[in-house]
Swiss-Prot record:
One GO CC term on file: cytosolic small ribosomal subunit
A GO BP annotation: translation
HAMAP family linked: Ribosomal_uS9_B
Domain of life according to the entry: Bacteria
UniProt KW Electron transport keyword: no
One Pfam family per UniProt: Ribosomal_S9
Listed GO MF terms: RNA binding; structural constituent of ribosome
Name of the protein in its database record: Small ribosomal subunit protein uS9
Lineage per the UniProt record: Bacteria, Bacillati, Bacillota, Bacilli, Bacillales
Ranges of biased composition (kind: Basic residues): 111-130
InterPro entries per record: Ribosomal_Su5_D2-typ_SF, Ribosomal_uS9, Ribosomal_uS9_bac/plastid, Ribosomal_uS9_CS, Ribsml_uS5_D2-typ_fold_subgr
Annotated signal peptide: none
Renumbered residue ranges of the record's region Disordered: 105-130
Similarity remark: Belongs to the universal ribosomal protein uS9 family.
Length: 130
């Protein structure tokens, strides 16, 4: 018998996460490693679990994630976005609570490019009057 799976793709900064929800007991596996091994910050792990806590499905599904690009924060945001989208496939009723928490909106903030003549995106070289 084929197992039921729900898919969602999440993006944040330069990270892309492909998320699979499988009925299980609440494990989160990122790139074949437990989430506590993969992401070293408890605050980011809580961020990732937010959609599951809001919909009260934390112990109902195993989350299998493939994520690439970006750093810890961007990847955590991408995983959170992907889980939220996958939960919509599970039950469209979750849309209102997830939308209210702002979990279905792709965060558009990106790193601003460095401009020539400047030291960073906006930081100008030191100005000397004389």
């Amino acid at each position: 018998m084929a197992q039921v799976q729900y898919y969602g793709t999440g993006r944040r900064k330069s990270s892309v996460a492909r998320v699979r929800l499988v009925p299980g007991e609440g494990r989160i596996v990122v790139n074949n490693r437990e989430i506590t091994e993969y992401i070293p910050f408890a605050a980011l792990i809580e961020d990732v679990k937010q959609p599951l806590n809001i919909t009260e499905t934390a112990n109902s599904y195993d989350v299998l994630v493939t994520v690439h690009g970006g750093g810890f924060s961007g990847q955590a945001g991408a995983i959170r976005h992907g889980i939220s989208r996958a939960l919509l496939e599970v039950d469209p009723e979750y849309r209102t609570s997830l939308k209210r928490a702002g979990l279905l909106t792709r965060d558009p903030r990106m790193k601003e490019r460095k401009k020539y003549g400047l030291k960073g995106a906006r930081r100008a070289p030191q100005f000397s009057k004389r």
